[in-house]
Amino acid sequence: TIGDGTAEDVQIRFDGNTVDYHLGLDDSADKLTIGKGSALGTTTSLAFDADGIISKPLLPFVHAYNSANDDNVAHNTTHKIEMDADFFDQNADFNNTNDVFTAPVTGKYWISGHVGLDAIDEDCNFWQVRVVTSNGNFRWADDPKSYNPPTDPFDCRISIGICVDMDSGDTAHLDYFQSGGASQVDIFGNNSTSLAGQQSYMTVYLVT
C-alpha cells in the first residue's frame, strides 16, 4: 500500500535521464494520473476518475471554424478555406493564422470538414472541397447539373471526412476549387458564437 489514507498526493516516479514520468493519485481531484514530470495534476497524459472514466487532456483534438464569410471567391484558383478561430484546440496543434493543422506525433488522424457555399454559378463546370495533407489529397466534387438548380445562383453544403496517416510534422487543411463560371461564390462563415451558427468548420483528432 502506498499512502496512509490521509489527504495527500502519492506517486511512483520514474526518474529518466532527461524526462521524468509519474503514476500517482491526484488527491485533490480524486484521479489516478499518468503524466510527465514529478508534479501531479500538471502535464497529465491519462487520468482515471472514481467512476472509471478515462480522459486524455493532451490528445490532439481541434474544432476550428471560419468566423466570417469569404465573398466572391475567385474561380479556376485553389482557395485555402479560412479557419481563423476555434472552439477548442486541446493540444495547440492548429494555426489560426495560416489555417493549418500540424500533427504533433505520427499516427492515424480523423479529419472532417463542413463547408457552406452560397451564390454558386450554375454555369461552372464543377466545384470541389479537398482535405489536403502532406501524404495525399482527398476530395468531394460535384457539378451544378446534378443538382438541377431551380435558380441561378444557388447554394450547397458539403461534408467530407477521412482517416489519414500522418507523420510528426505533417500538415492538413481544407481548400476549395471551382472550374469555370463566375467568381461569385461565397464561403459561409460563422456569424454567431454558438456551434449551431457554424457554416464552415474543420475537426481533427488523433485516433491511434
Indicate residue ranges for each PLM-predicted region.
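Self-maturation zones of extracellular/virion spikes and adhesins
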Residues: T1-T43, P60, N66-N72, C124, ...
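Extracellular beta-strand solenoids
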Residues: I2, F14, I34, F48-A50, ...
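Short small/polar-residue motifs
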Residues: N17-H22, T44-S45, D89-D93, N98
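Extracellular jelly-roll beta-sandwich "head" domains, especially the C-terminal globular C1q domain
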Residues: D51-T208
